[in-house]
């Protein structure tokens, strides 16, 4: 009975939080931190008691008092239907408002710590995305593509349907309809000269016996609420291993994906690039 009541309360609270306007949202987290943070006085008393009497029981009391009540609140919110997704969306909203509130900045960091446990790589599921993948997932691939915009369903089909094009995504078991990150791969004969060769709609398909190169040409993080958690390296390693198992002739792995921040850096250096004198022989 208590567990059921707890779930009902958590569901009700989650719905209330979603309905708050921005100022109410900020005030809610101010109140949570004020009422459910660590009881410093009780913790200090317990610490003093432990210094006098170093028992396992006293150490456990310190451990219990060191955990703030709001952390248990997040755990309970995580138990409701789609609770994990709702918490990810909650952190996304926190991040959008955190410049207006020091307490939201605190909860942004605190949720990140929890998420790093909940989204441990060992919990993630690698799935292949192709033209037969359900439409609701494909729509999100179009929306979340962050490197080379997908302009139409024909454009998407050209990236997913041919046998020499692959796409893989990580999912979390509690967010089965939400990709966390995905990578697009072209299987080619040697490295292509340009990205346009890779993503154009009408092109010849590389036959299986001619494939020797895997070109990772786009990788996109999908969830702003999981910002700060690195999935990319783990995804690429898993995909490279899987592709190698499926393609005996594959011996080169390259990337055409843009370097994050490179364009901004280049803009700042452009005047130097154009005005610097040519080096003398």
Residue ranges and their predicted role:
Residues 1-5, 274-281:
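Conserved small/polar residues in nucleotide/adenosyl-binding loops
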Residues 3-145:
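N-terminal low-complexity, Ser/Thr- and acidic-residue-enriched intrinsically disordered segments
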Residues 246-256:
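Conserved GNAT acetyl-CoA-binding A-motif
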Residues 257-270:
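Short, conserved secondary-structure transition motifs
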């Amino acid at each position: 009975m208590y567990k059921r009541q707890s779930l009902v309360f958590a569901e009700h609270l989650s719905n209330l939080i979603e309905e708050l306007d921005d100022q109410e949202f900020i005030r809610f987290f101010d109140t949570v931190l004020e009422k459910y943070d660590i009881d410093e006085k009780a913790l200090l008393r317990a610490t003093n008691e432990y210094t006098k009497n170093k028992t396992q029981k006293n150490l456990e009391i310190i451990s219990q008092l060191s955990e703030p009540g709001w952390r248990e609140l997040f755990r309970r919110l995580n138990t409701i239907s789609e609770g994990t997704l709702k918490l990810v969306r909650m952190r996304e909203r926190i991040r959008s408002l955190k410049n207006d509130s020091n307490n939201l900045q605190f909860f942004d960091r605190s949720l990140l710590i929890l998420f790093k446990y909940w989204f441990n790589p060992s919990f993630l599921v690698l799935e292949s995305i192709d033209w037969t993948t359900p439409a609701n997932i494909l729509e999100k691939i179009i929306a979340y593509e962050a490197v080379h915009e997908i302009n139409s369903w024909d454009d998407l089909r050209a990236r997913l349907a041919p046998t020499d094009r692959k796409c893989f995504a990580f999912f979390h078991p509690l967010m089965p309809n939400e990709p966390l990150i995905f990578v697009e791969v072209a299987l080619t004969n040697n490295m292509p000269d340009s990205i346009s060769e890779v993503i154009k709609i009408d092109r010849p398909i590389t036959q299986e016996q001619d494939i020797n190169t895997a070109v990772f040409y786009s990788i996109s993080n999908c969830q702003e609420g999981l910002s700060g958690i690195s999935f990319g390296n783990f995804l690429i390693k898993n995909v490279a291993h899987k592709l190698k198992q499926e393609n005996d002739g594959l011996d080169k792995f390259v990337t055409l994906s843009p370097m994050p921040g490179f364009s901004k850096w280049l803009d700042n250096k452009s005047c130097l690039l154009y005005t610097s004198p040519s080096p003398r022989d």
